[in-house]
Amino acid sequence: MLPAQYRMTRSTEFGATVSRGTRAAQPDLVLYTLRSDETGEPGPRVGLIVSKAVGNAVVRHRVSRRLRHAARGILERLDSRDRVVIRALPRSRDAGTQRFEQELHTALDRIHARTITARNGAPS
């Protein structure tokens, strides 16, 4: 389970992260990250988007639980100002926690590589 202090709950945070954040797509999910300028709430914040396209309520809740569990594994890699949104794709209904963990780490690696390249002034 993802501790409450790390959960993203405000719609404005979700919207800002998805619209202005860096995106990395994987087969089962899309990861959006944004480094927040605000210092109000400590710790990285993680939000989930699991739409009806994934399946019925039972399937969506199962996917959400697996994603929350997998998200715990990336918390130590995040800065306290990071905001992360994980969007489950329809294919995620068949994915297990280990596959989610692998895809989250891969997506985070891609985003970190992209932001480091952008900071150094090289084209991305």
Curated annotation (Swiss-Prot):
RNaseP catalyzes the removal of the 5'-leader sequence from pre-tRNA to produce the mature 5'-terminus. It can also cleave other RNA substrates such as 4.5S RNA. The protein component plays an auxiliary but essential role in vivo by binding to the 5'-leader sequence and broadening the substrate specificity of the ribozyme. Coiled coil: none annotated. It catalyses: Endonucleolytic cleavage of RNA, removing 5'-extranucleotides from tRNA precursor. PANTHER family: RIBONUCLEASE P PROTEIN COMPONENT. Consists of a catalytic RNA component (M1 or rnpB) and a protein subunit. The gene is rnpA. It is an enzyme of class 3 (hydrolase). It holds the Pfam family Ribonuclease_P. GO terms for molecular function: 3'-tRNA processing endoribonuclease activity; ribonuclease P activity; tRNA binding. It comes from Mycolicibacterium gilvum (strain PYR-GCK). This is Ribonuclease P protein component. GO terms for biological process: tRNA 5'-leader removal. InterPro entries: Ribosomal_Su5_D2-typ_SF, Ribsml_uS5_D2-typ_fold_subgr, RNase_P. Its EC number is 3.1.26.5. The keyword RNA-binding applies. Keywords: Endonuclease, Hydrolase, Nuclease, RNA-binding, tRNA processing. One of its GO terms (cellular component) is ribonuclease P complex.
